[in-house]
């Protein structure tokens, strides 16, 4: 009975450690100049394809209506 209790305790401890490592590894952030997404955030600044302090608007040609 003692062996079974110890194995269950070790198993639960391993699961708890894996959950802790998952939180630590997935909560990282990226410095300026590195590619980012909403799921891979910047440490500071704004995500505009790469981590930047300010996003610049991309101004291009507007579509024209053709008849």
From Swiss-Prot:
<dbReference type="GO" id="GO:0015459">
    <property type="term" value="F:potassium channel regulator activity"/>
</dbReference>
<feature type="modified residue" description="Isoleucine amide">
    <location>
        <position position="59"/>
    </location>
</feature>
<keyword id="KW-0872">Ion channel impairing toxin</keyword>
<feature type="disulfide bond">
    <location>
        <begin position="36"/>
        <end position="48"/>
    </location>
</feature>
<dbReference type="InterPro" id="IPR013141">
    <property type="entry name" value="Conotoxin-I_CS"/>
</dbReference>
<keyword id="KW-1220">Voltage-gated potassium channel impairing toxin</keyword>
<dbReference type="GO" id="GO:0005576">
    <property type="term" value="C:extracellular region"/>
</dbReference>
<feature type="disulfide bond">
    <location>
        <begin position="42"/>
        <end position="51"/>
    </location>
</feature>
<keyword id="KW-0165">Cleavage on pair of basic residues</keyword>
<keyword id="KW-0800">Toxin</keyword>
<keyword id="KW-0964">Secreted</keyword>
<keyword id="KW-0732">Signal</keyword>
<protein>
    <recommendedName>
        <fullName>Kappa-conotoxin-like 1</fullName>
    </recommendedName>
</protein>
<dbReference type="GO" id="GO:0090729">
    <property type="term" value="F:toxin activity"/>
</dbReference>
<feature type="disulfide bond">
    <location>
        <begin position="47"/>
        <end position="55"/>
    </location>
</feature>
<comment type="function">
    <text>Inhibits the vertebrate voltage-gated potassium channels Kv1.1/KCNA1 and Kv1.3/KCNA3.</text>
</comment>
<keyword id="KW-1015">Disulfide bond</keyword>
<keyword id="KW-0027">Amidation</keyword>
<feature type="signal peptide">
    <location>
        <begin position="1"/>
        <end position="26"/>
    </location>
</feature>
<keyword id="KW-0528">Neurotoxin</keyword>
<comment type="similarity">
    <text>Belongs to the conotoxin I2 superfamily.</text>
</comment>
<dbReference type="Pfam" id="PF17557">
    <property type="entry name" value="Conotoxin_I2"/>
</dbReference>
<keyword id="KW-0632">Potassium channel impairing toxin</keyword>
<dbReference type="InterPro" id="IPR020242">
    <property type="entry name" value="Conotoxin_I2"/>
</dbReference>
<feature type="disulfide bond">
    <location>
        <begin position="29"/>
        <end position="43"/>
    </location>
</feature>
<feature type="propeptide">
    <location>
        <begin position="63"/>
        <end position="67"/>
    </location>
</feature>
